[in-house]
Amino acid sequence: IIGRAHNLTETLNDVTAHAEMQAITAAANVLGGKYLNECTLYVTVEPCVMCAGAIAWAQTGRLVFGAEDEKRGYQRYAAQALHPKTIVVKGVLAEECAALMKAFFAAKR
């Protein structure tokens, strides 16, 4: 593990401070470069379009996510947003990930 992150949008009052963005920055800082083509990014829920764009720009080698996001997920709005060489694995522990996200947002409200 070269980087870990979580959503900091409320803490930083920054709508771009999603966990994926934080993790990409952390990994790039550790590696000393902006390309993550030999890295795997694991996330609880499908990235949004903004995060998918960052994942593409970082040329992330693999993306693994649990729950799909039917409202804001990149697949709904920009299915081709990721780098063409990025391997996508979806549905890993999907039910558990969906429950985590439901609890997370319930605590925010």
What do these predicted ranges mean?
Residues 9, 43, 67:
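Residues that line or immediately flank small-molecule/substrate-binding pockets and catalytic motifs
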